[in-house]
Amino acid sequence: MYLRSGLIALCFFLLAFTGVAQEKKRLSHDDYAGWKTINRSQLSPAGDWAVFEVNPQDGDGELVIRHVESGRQFVVPRAYRASISPGGKYVAFHIKPQQAVERQAKVDKKRREEMPVDSLGIFVFGTAGLEKFPALQSFAMPEDPSDWMAYIIDQARIETVEEESPEPEPEDPGQEPASGQEEETKKEKPGRVLYIYNPMTGAVKEVKHISAFIMAPAGNLVAGLTVKENKDTLSLYEVISVGLPGLTAKTVDSRYGEMKNLAVDRPGEQLAWLFSSDTTKAKSFDLYLYQQRRDRLNQVVGSSTSGMPAGYGPSENSTPRFSHNGERLFFGNAPLPEEEPEDTLLAEEKYRLDIWHWEDPMLQSQQLVMLNQLRRRNFQAVYHIRQGTMVQLADEDMPSVSLDPESNATRGMGQATAPYMIERQWTGGNPRDLYAVDLLTGQRKRVASRAEANAAMSPGGNYMIWYDTGSTSWKVYHMQQETITDVSAGIPFPVYNEDNDLPMFARPHGLAGWTPGDEAVLIYDRYDVWKVDPRGRRPVENLTGGYGRENNIRLRIQDLDEREHFVRLDKKVLLSAFNENAKRSGFYTLQDGRLSQLLMGDYLYSQLERARDAERYLWRRSTYTEFPDIWTSTADFSQGVKISDANPQQAGYYWGSVELVEWQDFDNETLQGLLYLPEDFDPARTYPMLVYFYERSSQGLHQHFIPAPSRSTINRSYCTSNGYIVFVPDITYKEGFPGESAYNAIVSGTKAMVERYPFIDRENMGLQGQSWGGYQIAYLVTRTNMFKAAMAGAPVSNMVSAYGGIRWQTGLNRQFQYEQTQSRIGGTLWERPIRYIENSPIFFVDKIETPLLMMHNDADGAVPWYQGIEMFVAMRRLGKPVWMLNYNDEAHNLTRWPNRMDLSVRMYQFFDYYLKGEPAPQWLKYGIPATDKGRVDGYELVE
């Protein structure tokens, strides 16, 4: 498919308006900070109010509170982490200190306890009033409809809240705090105070000396732990319950020691917590249960409880959790802590050592990364409240037990990974044995061995399901009948990814969910949704009627109600749609067996949300030129209205356009890619072209890229605004030949573009990519000289040495990447040594004639930065132009704003010099000596 003629026609159309176009600006690095994103959008339960954050990339953001129908809008500066009350009458949120105030506090070297802190903001819908309470620690709301909320204020830190002039309405109308709060603050500062508050009535209850609190999901109770610390004795802890709406407080328990990990059941009738009376640092805890209706308090589990493994007790690193029906209390047990002997050695008198043992389940490097997690490890148990019995469910051999969402079923799914831990070093997968676990007795039965993908419980707890990689099918285990059924056998199409080009099993397309009562499981093939009987008695049913496959449209059910565990086919079901050929997207409905199109177009539609109690929807819509603002509509989607405008300044800048292109690679396979052109494109001119790639990218035809400082890659919007064409080819791979596969796709695609479009300057083309893309660049410059300059981020240059390397962020060894996953060698170093050498750029550095800029950071947790060093010193040894940017203490992709800004400047200076003929910057021509580090940036251009 050739570049659509409409694009070329558009270019001539634009030429007719050059006078207007010249008024626009080109994007610069100074523009990044003010470009905004939209985050955390949500609808009120009735769908009448929308709330979302609008945040610049650097600076103070804002919270937008908008009435959907009228468009009336309120903006709260610096507000974030908003929660709409389940009753739908107000929204509460954090309010940050001003960024400038925080910065000044750091400049002034204020202590942590003196730093400015968040405030609480509450906005009641339909008013212009904003309540603000300083020194917020946290707040919470129940799950069920209610007007109540609870929050903690740290009275001792109120003075650290910034003093600022009142903001104009409706941002800050200056209302007084809720009744009783200001007066109490004047009398004393008791530390952390819990306020239980109803913003609709002003009713408030305070609980001093609060340590932690929790709200019952039903919204009828707040429980808290209070603590009064004593210097010479144990602290006095109390469990306080406050009933709603009456605000009746009750002391449930009072003891000297330590209480923690408070839990409450759904109706607010039972409380649980851990308590220890130990005075030592290593504390043993007991589990307590309070039943409100009976006003009964019991220690229900301790280290000597029947059923407790020897030497174990309730773990302080696990918070108890009630089942939905309140009949079970789940918690974790762990070995009892032992007091460490007194240490009298000085630091310089101790050895420091890691011992790597060949039979360790995990490498030492991985153990050290996970050290805190391993120390906090505990094993799930259950206390059956009616029976008064404890059952241990998980243990060292089977450390994980999954339950149904409401934890009401009598069986769970156990998972044991220990038999396969060592081999994960080179397989990279996560095989496990699956067990059916009886929650009443703790008995377990092994159901499957070496299950590798997508194991889960059905929502009703009647079945276990997993994808069997050997048979490429979905298997279901019936908990009661203890039988296994191949449920996808009747689906006439693959239920796995047919495009898989990794030397490992193909991943399944996944599950859409289950129908009520676990009556059917919904399974995806590439395009459609299938209804399958988990017992295998009824024939499979294609719910979408083959429409997806017939039209090359991938249909996926949207889960829009977090309270719903099932897919209810008796109601309207919404599906997302993506056309794999044209890259168009949209939404469909499935109702009464009929599939209907709601919305479909040349956009990327995403982030669909629905109001809890109304047919009101939010979604995002974007193209390369259109920012993904928020749109809203009712159920038919026919009258969509845009309710945000995050970046109106974009209209004043040159941008660009993108088209889907096709070509034949050197093996005559048809590939797709994306070609981006400048907005003020003139087909009579030639333009330098940057070629960027990773693997497959054409599905992102309508992805929008806000101008942003680079983490590691080019910004396509910045490039087209500044006169670059950008080509992004798809790459397909052959096992054992990752480098040559990249060459086949990228070089063939680049040649096809320059032969097809004379406006591409074939003498001024560059390469850019990061990580796997960086490796492919390092390989390409050893195979071709058609590119004038290349920039590679975090490249693997030597697969031989990288094979035995460590991914330091996780501690994992890298062997699995070459044998099973992305690097695609498909065998070990000793099985396929030639493949490792042939695909390693380091062995062919003498062929390189392309100037190469690399970025490889010394805290890279994915690709050891020694790989960049190997490439650098080899090219330096051969006198070839090469530079390496090493951002100190930075990760695989840059995280710190100053580093991102710096990389953006240097990367585009590099390309501008080689591809546009602009003067070289000082750093590129002369470097920067270590003696000038941090003092000289070298940005100045040298004529």
What are the residue ranges of the model-derived segments?
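Surface beta-strand/loop "capping" patches
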Residues: Q373, D561-R568, Y653-N668, R935
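Hydrophobic/aromatic beta-strand patches that form the interior of the parallel beta-sheet core
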Residues: V391, M413, T485, W631, ...
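Bacterial Sec-dependent N-terminal signal peptides
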Residues: M1-E23, V796, G805, D858
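Cap/lid segment of the alpha/beta-hydrolase catalytic domain
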Residues: G490-L502, F637-Q639, S644-N764, Q768-Q770, ...
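Glycine-rich His-Gly loop
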Residues: T417, F578, S622, Y692-R696, ...
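Active-site-proximal cap/loop segments of hydrolase catalytic domains
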Residues: F705-E943
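Beta-propeller folds
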Residues: A21-Y617, S622-P628, T632-S633, P921, ...
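Active/binding-pocket-proximal capping segment
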Residues: M479-V495, G536-E550, G593, A635-Q639, ...
